[in-house]
Amino acid sequence: MQNRKWILTSLVMTFFGIPILAQFLAVVIAMLGVGLAGIIEVCNILITPTIYLLLKIFMLALGALMLFFSGRVGNVPEFCYVGYDGVGFAVIP
């Protein structure tokens, strides 16, 4: 009697229990993956524009500093080069 009970339990687990548990495990893993992807996407939506904005501000400030340190730009002819020793920037007012 004891062996029949274990054989029946093994058959039920083999053909019903384990596939159902595998489906539940797959659903849990899928939900974790979707949640992780959602978190990454929300962070990407919030962080990426900020990084690009800071990068643009930095590049504009760097360009302004280069123009400031390379020479006077106020009273220049219509087209000139600002710089020295063959290194110059074309300035078109």
UniProtKB/Swiss-Prot annotation:
It comes from the Bacteria. Missing up to 410 C-terminal residues compared to orthologs. This is Protein YzgL. The lineage of its organism: Bacteria, Pseudomonadati, Pseudomonadota, Gammaproteobacteria, Enterobacterales.
